[in-house]
């Protein structure tokens, strides 16, 4: 947010800080100031001039020869190329010797044989961005009001003797998205109460009820909606003070009605919207949910397709505005407007945020509604806006408002204690200092023995728990005043077994070719339930920053999918990621959620890229399966993993398996469903997710060192014909159980399916390796062990030896 230093000073009688000092002070209290720009730093010798005469340059069609009176005794001749320059205008003149932004210095010059002693300036030449210059002056010079005195400083007149503070407002401090909010923050810093904005004293006539009525169908989405009427208005340019305030805040002036709504938004942080009353086409406004595929053409001339869940303002039949986002072209205020219906409302942040994101339409209004606003300042903002429109347009302010009010006001009181504040902050703040801090913040403090009861004003809706109060105390007391303390301990530092295991896991996965990812624990309601290991309920935030970050995740995989999609959209086609992080499950009542540490991974694209030696190898199920099995081996886990084919929503039904260890399911591994891959523009993609605690709790095998075998091993190949639904894990287990002590390895080297084998049959071929560390094996030993294996396979699995 761009904040005018001079505007801040208007809230206080005696302001003690320079712009630079103010920026530093605000940063120290927790709101970052990204920069302070002195607008007049590169401006000098710029005054108001009056164009006495204007005629075409004799040798150039696009140049004008102007005689201009400035603060000098005699008028000067200036050659000007602006298409809108004319005699009788009050203009901005950079005199000879003047300095302008970009290092430009004005000199006496000759243009096509005619002397030019200065320059008539556009706003862009004074440093204003082109996007904030009024459209009427976008391609020419800026024409000042006729009443402006000739010869005075244009720098002062345009408010350029000012500094702009660029404030980086975090989502939790949306109260500072207004000048009133900034003034309260500054007041707490300099220990002064800011003056409250006052509306013009304009008499009212008539009743708003005679003009319009209001109906709200969903009070949850629209707790408050009101209309203020102003009639007999004249649409014209806003006064210079209003235009300059808007331009310095990065907003383009339009006319005296639209500019007032933008000004009130800046002043109070409360969006207003103006309708041309005569274009509404009805004497009734209905606020309702949009119908699916309903259409509206917005003020930017774009046709928008609405969805269920968007809130719209209608004339009872068709939409005239998207609530909290943008008005409709249908009811736009234009030069012919004579009566304005001024809207002031509170819309739910979720509804506005949803519409803004889905329509790709982010406005100053939607930003404030999405981040939250003070529900109890809307009447003040609406009254001020209506009175100011009446004053600037010469209109008649209609008495009263038409409103629907479903707000519920609750006093926000939070308890803490002086002892607790000092213990947590590590300070020795006295009670009198605490009282001063809350007085500076504008909070009401009640002391009952050692208990402090703090009543928080509605303008600070971000403060809801004790920790917020402690943060406010720390901010105003001064982070740099809090003493640095170190914990006293005599315990020698070291890594726990679980910390060592986690390091081993990370090192192994990175060695296997995966890159570590770090994603948000916050996600959308939709993603919160996707691909979870457990069916437990999700955890919703009470005050989410947005709908996209409204729930705590129950699985890491959806975030990795988004990360892969982001990379592939930027032509990074081979992606291999892993993340070790926390997932959350809801508990009954107000108990804290269950937290579990999970490990998740994703691979897509080619596992081996092509070079002069080999062709590229795409990722597949067995690549990721091998990585997971290698991880278990690296951790020294005694039990083997077992894989069981399962079906899981959003995963491929034929390429998904549960991961089982010591008889418990600890995770899953599989390919994404083709529909999911298509929705994220992914090619074949494989994912896994494992409960880390289950891995770390598994029995670790003791490391036993054996000498390298002195005797040779012997192998036997077995080809089995079995039912199609008999899996490799089952066959391998039977072989292990009956192979005896001499069997040291089993390797599956071939799988074949075909009509020649018979219906629902498949052939699997294994190599069995036998070894005796004490002596050389003889044929009889190996044959005896092999026969036992064959008999067991025939008896238990009805296998046919081929």
From Swiss-Prot:
GO MF: ATP binding; catalytic activity, acting on a protein; magnesium ion binding; phenylalanine-tRNA ligase activity; transferase activity; tRNA binding
The keyword DNA-binding is annotated on this UniProt entry: no
E.C. numbers: 6.1.1.20
Family note: Belongs to the phenylalanyl-tRNA synthetase beta subunit family. Type 1 subfamily.
Organism from which the protein derives: Listeria innocua serovar 6a (strain ATCC BAA-680 / CLIP 11262)
InterPro entries: aa-tRNA-synth_II/BPL/LPL (IPR045864), B3/B4_tRNA-bd (IPR005146), DNA-bd_dom_put_sf (IPR009061), Fdx_antiC-bd (IPR005121), Fdx_antiC-bd_sf (IPR036690), NA-bd_OB-fold (IPR012340), Phe-tRNA-ligase_IIc_bsu (IPR045060), Phe-tRNA-ligase_IIc_bsu_bact (IPR004532)
Top-level taxon in the UniProt lineage: Bacteria
Residues of the B5 domain: 409-484
Cellular location(s): Cytoplasm
Keyword check for Magnesium: yes
Protein name per UniProt: Phenylalanine--tRNA ligase beta subunit
